[in-house]
Amino acid sequence: MSTELENVKKQEEEYSASNIQVLEGLEAVRKRPAMYIGDIGEKGLHHLVYEVVDNSIDEALAGYCTDIDVTINEDNSITVRDNGRGIPTDYHEKEGKSALEVVLTVLHAGGKFDKGSYKVSGGLHGVGVSCVNALSTLLIAEIRSRDGKVYRQTYSKGAPTSQVEVIGECSDRGTTITFKPDESIFTLTTEYKYDILANRLRELAFLNKGIRLNLYDKRKDDEGKTREDHFYSEEGLKEFVQYLDATRGTPIIDQIIYLDTERNGVPVEVAMQYNDSFSENVHSYVNNINTIESGTHLTGFRRALTRTLKKYAEDSGMLAKLKFDINGDDFREGLTAVVSVKVQEPQFEGQTKTKLGNDEVSAAVDQAMSAALGHYLEENPKDAKAIVSKVILAATARHAARHAREMVQRKTVLSGAGLPGKLADCSSRDRSIAEIFFVEGDSAGGTAKSGRDRNFQAIMPLRGKILNIEKAQEHRMWENEEIKNMFTALGVTIGTEEDSKALNLEKLRYDKIIIMTDADVDGSHIATLMLTFFFRKMKELIENGHVYIATPPLYLVKKGKQERYCWTEKERDTITAEFGKGAHVQRYKGLGEMNAHQLWETTMNPDTRILRQVNIENAAEADRIFSMLMGDEVPPRREFIEKNAHYANIDA
């Protein structure tokens, strides 16, 4: 037996109660759950699953687990099963109870804090499965142990309701956790969304090549069918970039640039590809956590990319005739990249604690990236020339866009920030209560103007479909009248004291920006164009929770003097049955079919309306979907629409 295999065997045998370290008690979790899982809404609900899956991923990173199954049960409980070593069940001397009970009842207890057990660990909050236990009315832990026995213990709201019991024998090893979230804590929803879990498991499969992640949904849809997906990646980040790039135009280089190395004790993995699109699509991860606020690892990547490409471009003489400087943005136009690092003790900063602060990681990524990219450019001169040509085109377009933008912003200042003529503004200047509706067409705009509360609601009619930002270079955006009017109406500009390219929200005039369109194909297209614009050019508005979609009712059911609005077919059928014989159903195909009073009552009145807040649960997946919906590739768009058509309710 080799020394390496002996060490793995020894470590496997020694993973027991003594490896479990305890940092903190569980008392506070039920009192302040948002402190531990982010929030008690949909995001926090799904975070419970991630905490349990992270334990299994940690086992995989340590080399002991290859398969992880996640099942959404019919009652919206979750079961996570892995084939790792199994949580130890032996007696924990210091705590006076089994190691299993320590892991499940003490916050931050786990082998991941013991450097002898796990080298690195995921888990943004790092609170472990005990937090899941505290926030569940039922948790069942089943351990297939190394002694060939199956151990079981049950819990409720963090407290054990049984002893650790032997319930059978087994020939394999692993952990199975089943939990049911507490409805008294998750008051908004306890219903798991398949797509949110699927996106995260897909992401984890790409980030951890060689691990099989399976998702099963035992809940039946309207046709009596269940769902399942299986995620496995042989090539990891290379396949991740291919997946993200499949909807983003045509690659301009022959192969994906890839590196997987270690610098100064920091494992660094990068995959990148250039295509002919006009936007940057770079995603970064630390220990499998999506660092949406970037951090030192991304700083190192960008610095190395700019410096290495610029040096090659200068040495090749391709920049000799350029009459203006190129900058970092030019080197990243059309770039799709994933940067993943593993850090033993990550320091997270920023508003959402998703910004890496470790200084040593920047140098590690910079060194690794410089060496790999420099070698690639020398070995592949054809690809190198294609990349530099793309950079020069990007610089030329940026120069034209800056000139167009300055003209627009200068004109706005000189004209005293005159608002667009079509804007029916609200009288309040209190941004915290003000809201603006972007409405499809002058007809619906007229109804909305009549129905609104002019004290705090502004109406901005849109003339037809706005520019498709996904396919347009930036200077075209600044030449587009509708988009210029949107910037002016919102009071948003480009450039802050810290960053001349950042979105400036200081003079944002409204707290809520509401997209209100018809429930038909054209209306959905306009809404998607608007969302693409906000996602690509004003992402901070989405991240700060300002963007919403109005949901007008689809039906009005009437019988005599009784009338009820319905937003779904199921609701319509229930009300129709309730009203009985003689009920009349009206289908609303457009906002213009409602009068001002009806539009106010159903869609604009804060007390009765239904607004859907736009948020970015998964930045990489959101980017891919926008590229697919608004890009040039038809087959993936058709496949997406066919797969998701039953979630939509629009008339073709």
For the regions a protein language model found, what residue spans apply to each?
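C-terminal interaction appendages of subunits in large macromolecular complexes
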Residues: 396-415, 430-435, 446, 450-452, ...
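Conserved short strand/loop->alpha-helix "switch" segment adjacent to the catalytic nucleotide/phosphoryl-transfer site
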Residues: 31-50
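GHKL-family ATPase ATP-binding module
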Residues: 1-19, 26, 48-50, 58-60, ...
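Short adenine-binding "F-helix/F-box" segment of the Bergerat
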Residues: 92-93, 100
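Glycine-rich ATP-lid/hinge loop adjacent to the conserved G-boxes
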Residues: 36-40, 111-122
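A short glycine-centered beta->alpha linker in the GHKL/HATPase_c
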Residues: 86-91
